[in-house]
Amino acid sequence: MKKTKSLRKRLILENDKLFREIIRARDKVCQKTSKVCNLQVCHFWRRNILRTRWDLDNACLLTGGIHFYWAHSHFQDFQAFWLKRLGKDRYDKLELKARYVSPVRMEDLLFTHYELKKKYSNLQGQNKINLRRDVYVEV
């Protein structure tokens, strides 16, 4: 018998789907090479840090090769790129948010989901992009 996922886990996965679509719509191309194929959402602070996982300042599009090579092998260059991309103030705020240790409650996940759905709906309403229809959660 297949085990059903908890509401928390489903909400995290749905937030990931919404966030992925928002980042793809925002960046459109690899932020290092400007290529348009094999794109992946790349996080500066690890995805297991839920405080920054869905922060728009914490992600950009990179090709798979650049993501693996640059972000995971040459971290100092990657960090310099991120600092230049965000500026010192936004970078410091993101770092503070990432290093702040506290549990992420269900209410936090629900609020994040609401905010992501709002951004997603705004993108849909503006007809700027063709968003996939499979991004939906019932809470």
Model region roles, listed by residue range:
Residues 1-18, 37, 94-139:
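A boundary/linker detector
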